[in-house]
Amino acid sequence: LLKVLIHVCHSRNEDHTYTTTAPSSGGRRFHVNCLKRDFRLILTGEKWLDELVDRYAGNRGGGGSIDLVMHLIGINFVQAVRVCLEAAE
């Protein structure tokens, strides 16, 4: 997920003050800007959650890089796969 953030987001800063309720999960919080939109993401392994989206919204989080790219830049599945492949190069 970090490779994708680096590839698609203009700015990203890790919040080193963030502490998770389950330290063994390895969750990390990032403040990112992508296409002039702000996101506050928690990344835990291959899962992610956008804290700035209403908790009852259906698109608040997901699993994997493709879902993350679709959320960050608002593109469809096929386009997101291409972006992820570019990020992996």
At which residue positions do the language-model features occur?
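N-terminal structured subdomain of primase-like DNA metabolism proteins
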Residues: L1-E89
